[in-house]
Swiss-Prot record:
GN (gene name): CYP17A1
Descriptive protein name: Steroid 17-alpha-hydroxylase/17,20 lyase
Gene3D superfamilies, A to Z: Cytochrome P450 (1.10.630.10)
Known role: A cytochrome P450 monooxygenase involved in corticoid and androgen biosynthesis. Catalyzes 17-alpha hydroxylation of C21 steroids, which is common for both pathways. A second oxidative step, required only for androgen synthesis, involves an acyl-carbon cleavage. The 17-alpha hydroxy intermediates, as part of adrenal glucocorticoids biosynthesis pathway, are precursors of cortisol.
Signal peptide from the UniProt entry: none
Species of provenance: Sus scrofa (Pig)
Cofactor needs: heme
Species classification: Eukaryota, Metazoa, Chordata, Craniata, Vertebrata
Family annotation (PANTHER family): STEROID 17-ALPHA-HYDROXYLASE/17,20 LYASE, STEROID 17-ALPHA-HYDROXYLASE_17,20 LYASE
Amino acid sequence: MWVLLVFFLLTLTYLFWPKTKGSGAKYPRSLPVLPVVGSLPFLPRRGHQHMNFFKLQDKYGPIFSFRLGSKTTVVIGDHQLAKEVLLKKGKEFSGRPRVMTLDILSDNQKGIAFADHGTSWQLHRKLALSTFSLFKGGNLKLENIINQEIKVLCDFLATRNGESIDLAQPLSLAMTNIVSFICFNFSFKKGDPALQAIVNFNDGILDAVGKEILYDMFPGIRILPSQTLENMKQCVRMRNELLREILENRKENYSRNSITNLLDIMIQAKTNAESNTGGPDHNLKLLSDRHMLATVADIFGAGVETSASVVKWIVAFLLHYPLLRKKIQDAIDQNIGFNRAPSISDRNQLVLLEATIREVLRFRPVSPTLIPHRAIIDSSIGEFTIDKDTDVVVNLWALHHNEKEWHRPDLFMPERFLDPTGTQLISPSLSYLPFGAGPRSCVGEMLARQELFLFTAGLLQRFDLELPDDGQLPCLVGNPSLVLQIDPFKVKIKERQAWKEAHTEGSTS
């Protein structure tokens, strides 16, 4: 018995003790490492991970490492090193680590966001980018689709005029319909249970991700029961059942002469692969229903919650800074008025609004730490050696709050993105990557930027957004999951008198 126990402990020590580094190699400074548990006892246990990593830079520098179980992770908190990882050596660091919770989400690394580097990821990213190119003009112009959902949202909010409400649900419904049009070429009708179901699935998944971090750090304990993981699996199963039903319906109605959405593009790619006309990357195995569903789920997950979350952050900051809101509304009144919807072409005139959006993305980035990358070959970052299969985390929070790069980074200052005259947008620092960069950059960046501008402009054109009756200001700390979520808050919706007068005149003329 004792012999077996000693053998077991020696085996664990061999597996989890850091291996001897190559001669002459220089590695990033590491947190202390113990057998089996690695650096876990030395990682801060309170607070948010991105902030803790930022504080660790004071001791270990802008690039450091730690070890959990048998896995080494390198953390980057400098924009030059981050761009080396994301851009200069983007292909070398384009892998994704195997993480239990994300494997559940991605059906074992299918789709785009959590897929490992390889032909499948490259193909589905290419198909997603091709889809967004459909929406650059004509009847499918993305701006028109967004503005239609903004009108539906604003008409609903007008029925709650004078009330204090939480915008989370109506914003998620609006964003879901936009993504639905991109993926399926249809929007859900008001009250459709499928629409509410998708929102509920996304909420359930977001609630689960990050709660079971020990299962991600130590895969060996996955045999232990977890109610959170079971809830997550159930949400994913129900989501996939709904998406599979939509996919089957789209297959039946597919026409190669009318390609209007993501499912059409993927079905077309599969049809071409079956007839050997799709090119070498169009492998039938990579275009299975499960691969398609994973990609659609990625677009929904990223396209709905990220934009909805940022709009909520923008509204929260406007409640904290009512004079800023008034200045933005004055610019909207002067440059747009009340007789047409805001357009992307108005960005050059509404520079304070655009600067506010950029500052929100700096101050409270959607993903304070980017989804981890993985070195697919032996490589280097700066002067340091990085072994193959090392995980690399870019701490966006550190980039966006670096005192050497930003003037008073802990203050919310939209004017930092404006020139001294306040009339031109500028880039005050290179340490700014709200959507990542390189091969793994956000495929929906164009969609997100348009949504943030048009939703904020549309809301402020029609409504005054004020503190609720209890006077409670939103908490601006946030809770990180897949995205940095703001705590629930309420805002009083008041339809603007100038808007009502303009539309009363229009209806009687």
